[in-house]
Each structure stands twice: as structure tokens, then as C-alpha cells.
Amino acid sequence: MIAAAWAVFQHYGEAGFLDLNRTMLDISLRLRGGIEAIPGFHVLGDPAMYVWGFASDALDVMAVADAMAERRWHLGRQLTTPPSLHVVLTPIHAPVVDDFLRDLREVADAIGRSGRTGEKRSNYAT
């Protein structure tokens, strides 16, 4: 991780590196706020960076992952306690935050009405 940050810093320079980090922080804060505004969802912990998870006490998050995948959004499935969905943010996510949140809200509403459950599996990779 340190080597990757150093390489990015070398490529973009200090001003570019700081601008990139401002963009990433904006993406993370917008997404976190949007997720927490959807009834039933909460972000796990108080993440300071761009890799974190969210869960729900009201919805089956594996069903949420299935439904989001049907809309071409792929979330990491965490078979933890509580089960959660994992996001890894990059600058390419900046223009799609609102689209993602719209789809997540629609999926949450549909699952809340239907009681749909999802496949209990993780999608870890090596």
C-alpha cells in the first residue's frame, strides 16, 4: 500500500496527489451519507479511507447484492457478523455515486416489500 501511494505521488506530484485524495474523500463521504440515508442501512464503524462495509438490520444484504448485480453493480459479500457488503472506491466512481445510490434505494425498497433473501456466499479472491 505504501509503495502504491508513493508511485501515485511520484506520477501526479504533490498537487495532483492532494487533488486525487480530495476527490476520493468526496466520493466516500457522498456514498456513506447516501447509504446511511436509506432506511435500514448503516456503515460499519467510522472508516477514514476508501475501503469499508455496510450492513442492514432490516434487509438481507445478500439479496441486496444479488439485486444490485442484476443492475451491474458488484459488491463484495462479507459473511461476517453482521453480514455486510464491501466497497472499494476509486476515482472512477465519482460520476456514478448518484446512480449507485438511486439503484440501491430502489433495490432496498423492493426487497423490503418482497422479503427476498439472497445467496449466502462470499466472493473473496486471491
Model-based region annotation:
Residues 5-29:
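Structural signature of PLP-dependent enzymes
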Residues 18-21, 28-32, 37-39, 46-126:
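Non-catalytic terminal extensions of PLP-dependent enzymes
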Residues 7-11, 41-46:
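Short low-complexity stretches enriched in small and charged residues
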Residues 1-2:
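Mobile "lid/hinge" segments at catalytic clefts and subdomain interfaces of large enzymes
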